[in-house]
Amino acid sequence: MNSNRSLLIMGLLLVSFLIFTQWQQDYNPEIQAQKQAMAQAQTQQVANQSSDVPASSNAASINEQSTKGKTITIETDVLRLTVDTLGGDVVDSDLLKYNAELDSNTPFELLQDNGKVLYVAQSGLVGKNGIDTTAGRAQYQATAEKFALAEGQDEIALPLTFEKDGVVYTKTFTLKRGSYNVAVNYHIKNGTAETLEVQPYGQLKHTLVESTGNFAMPTYTGGAYSSSEVNYKKYSFDEMAKANLSVDTKAGWAAVLQHYFVSAWIPNQDAENNLYTRTGNGVGTIGYRGPVTQVAPNGEATITSHLWTGPKDQAAMAQVANNFDLTVDYGWAWFIAKPLFWLLTFIQSIVSNWGLAIIGVTIVVKTILYPLTKAQYTSMAKMRMLQPRIQEMRERFGDDRQRMSQEMMKLYKEEKVNPMGGCLPILLQMPIFIALYWTFMEAVELRHAPFFGWIQDLSAQDPYYIFPLLMGGSMYLLQKMSPTPIADPVQQKVMNFMPVMFTVFFLWFPSGLVLYWLTSNLITIAQQWLIYRNLEKKGLHTRVKK
């Protein structure tokens, strides 16, 4: 197999991958159903949905509406939350280390309730003695309107209190320096002579939206959960509209995902919880209900949970709950993507530039594949040396294809030539390319990460298309270095068009991925020149003699 045909196969594999990805985005039956469900749901009213509470294990479903209370803010070095005193819901979260836009000083707003988009984190107590009922939700009191982490402090707490019929409920949000993991705990002090029964819940509500992106950078916006039976599963808004999720599990979590960021409720991991979803009035809800907690007369009880609202930081999320880091979804290529991401971050820790880290990863990958690359070109050179004998066989055996095939296999065995030896490096490179594709798509570390000059965001496409054009030029040069021209005119036309086609495709790819492909092409050019030079010295002709 000559190198032009190798490029052709690689091109066809890449095109197939892109076509499949776009088909999934546009024509997958589930996606089409999701669009229809959202269109129907969004014709309904969205207003006043932020106060819905779920049904408890012994109560009917509640769809209560009421006005908002006061808002309280609590801020650390990385996170600012806005909490509504009515119900103690988190109605806004600002990620202070992430800008909304590349050249903006405005922090990225994850949770929000701005009249256009509803995305809030609710929690409360339902059940026999719950304070979130059809009659209304708890109106908490706070000691101040603003809480901020002071210099030298490692954590800060926002306590909200509510007293009713001799029972004091304290809902406390605790934030730690440098962390997006928020402890949300209830302390119940029962001053009555009766045993109380309450059931905690936490849920995320999000306006029904479609997943966004283009064929090169598709993104997912929707639900996901983890249980004792399923490590990680996406549960889209479409699936929520079709059927309400109800999963009983020990531990687990429920989340809403979007590109680079995630919010999730993580209940008590030692308790039996119910994960659920529902949709209505243009809003999708995913959350959990914990077990019933009994509070003895004149006794006290504490109920714990955590809320994550922040970036998809794999290392940090792995410390929060089992399988939470799987929200960084590498698809089927995860077993390649994870070590590649580790290598990428390791190199970046040394060179302090994500673009240089990508170049470093490319060099490592090409070095590992070099023995296979060398074997590929050596096999191709030997195949060219056998062309006169193969041509002689064609003339001798004519239309006797079976005899021709037998003699060719015999010849390959005698000369120790593998006719498919040129395919293996290509087949190995494509999974690596796909793994890198999803690594660059999912890694929040690359968001707004500069390289140099005009490349100020490696997660976005090249604004001036310089990298795609250079990549196309390098591919054209690599093609022209091929020692054997393609005889078939149709294949030759396809090959001539391949650099142009690749260039057009890569116009929309993240510049980090284009940088990888460009660097890979340049290294391949150098490797090919070196290998052919050494083969010529050994008497193996790398070009067909005219």
Curated annotation (Swiss-Prot):
| Single Gene Ontology MF annotation | membrane insertase activity
The record, for InterPro entries, names: Membr_insert_YidC, Membr_insert_YidC_N, YidC/ALB3/OXA1/COX18, YidC/Oxa/ALB_C, YidC_ALB_C, YidC_periplasmic_sf
Keyword check for Membrane, yes or no: yes
How does the record say this protein sits in the membrane? Multi-pass membrane protein
Any one GO BP annotation for this protein: protein transport
Instruction: Tell me which domain of life the UniProt entry assigns to the organism this sequence originates from.
Output: Bacteria
Keyword field contains Hydrolase:
no
Name its cellular compartments. Answer: Cell inner membrane
Which residue ranges are recorded for the region named Disordered?
A: 43-64
Q: What is its main location?
A: membrane
Cellular component GO terms, alphabetical:
plasma membrane
CDD domains, alphabetized: 5TM_YidC_Alb3, EcYidC-like_peri
Any Pfam family: 60KD_IMP
**Assembly and binders:** Interacts with the Sec translocase complex via SecD. Specifically interacts with transmembrane segments of nascent integral membrane proteins during membrane integration.
Task: Give the family, as the similarity comment puts it.
Answer: Belongs to the OXA1/ALB3/YidC family. Type 1 subfamily.
Q: What does this protein do?
A: Required for the insertion and/or proper folding and/or complex formation of integral membrane proteins into the membrane. Involved in integration of membrane proteins that insert both dependently and independently of the Sec translocase complex, as well as at least some lipoproteins. Aids folding of multispanning membrane proteins.
Q: What is this protein called?
A: Membrane protein insertase YidC
